[in-house]
Amino acid sequence: MKELQTVLKNHFAIEFADKNLLETAFTHTSYANEHRLLKISHNERLEFLGDAVLQLLISEYLYKKYPKKPEGDLSKLRAMIVREESLAGFARDCQFNQFIKLGKGEEKSGGRNRDTILGDAFEAFLGALLLDKDVAKVKEFIYQVIIPKVEAGEFEMITDYKTHLQELLQVNGDVAIRYQVISETGPAHDKVFDVEVLVEGKSIGQGQGRSKKLAEQEAAKNAVEKGLDSCI
C-alpha cells in the first residue's frame, strides 16, 4: 500500500490518516474470501457509500453547470458519467488497477482489468476518502479526476445517438430498427464488440466498443453522420 499512498500524495495531495481504511477500499471480496481466517474486510460497504456521495456530487455539479437543462437530460448525462465503463476509466487514470488486492482465481481470470471490479474499487475509494476526510475532500478529488472530462464533452458525445437516430427515422411513421453483433474479439474480460444497426433489414451503420451498448451507440452515430438518405 505504500506505493498507492505515494501516488495519492504526489498526484492528488491525499494522505490517509487511517491506512487500514484505504487498504479495505482496495480489497476485493475474492481476496477476503481466500483469507477468511485473517478476517480481512472487503470493499463492498465502502462501495455503497462511495456510490452515494458520487451521485450527490455529480448531481450538484450538473444542476449548477447546466441551469437550463431539463431533469431528463441531467439524469441521462449523470448516468453516462457514473456508469461502470466510466468509473473503470477513472480508476485506470488514477492507476488504481495496480493496487487492487484480488484472490488468486480472480487475478488469473483477468479480474484486474475487469470494469466491474475497477469501478467498484473507485467508488470504494470515494467512500473511504469521505470517512477519512470529509465531503469537501471527495469533491476536490472528483473535480480533479472527473469534471475535466465532463467539461471536455466526453460524456455528451454518446448521450443519445440511439434515441436521436430513432427520432429521425420514425418522423414519418414506425420503422423496424435493430442492432446486431457482427463479431466479438478479445478475451472474456476485455472483449471488443462490432455492431451494425439495421432498418427494415438494411445495414445503415456500424460501430465498435468495449461493450455491446457502447458499440450500439457508435453504430447509431455512424448512421446519423451518414445522413437519412443512406438509411432509407
UniProtKB/Swiss-Prot annotation:
Quick one: a GO biological-process term for this protein? rRNA processing
Please tell me where this protein is predominantly located. Answer: cytoplasm
Ranges where the DRBM domain occurs: 160-229
**Active site (UniProt):** D51, E123
Under Enzyme Commission nomenclature, its number is 3.1.26.3
Tell me yes or no: is Membrane among this UniProt entry's keywords: no
Q: Which InterPro entries match?
A: dsRBD_dom, RNase_III, RNase_III_dom, RNase_III_sf
Q: Which PROSITE patterns match?
A: DS_RBD, RNASE_3_1, RNASE_3_2
Annotated family: Belongs to the ribonuclease III family.
Q: What does this chain do?
A: Digests double-stranded RNA. Involved in the processing of primary rRNA transcript to yield the immediate precursors to the large and small rRNAs (23S and 16S). Processes some mRNAs, and tRNAs when they are encoded in the rRNA operon. Processes pre-crRNA and tracrRNA of type II CRISPR loci if present in the organism.
Q: How does it assemble?
A: Homodimer.
List the protein's name.
Ribonuclease 3
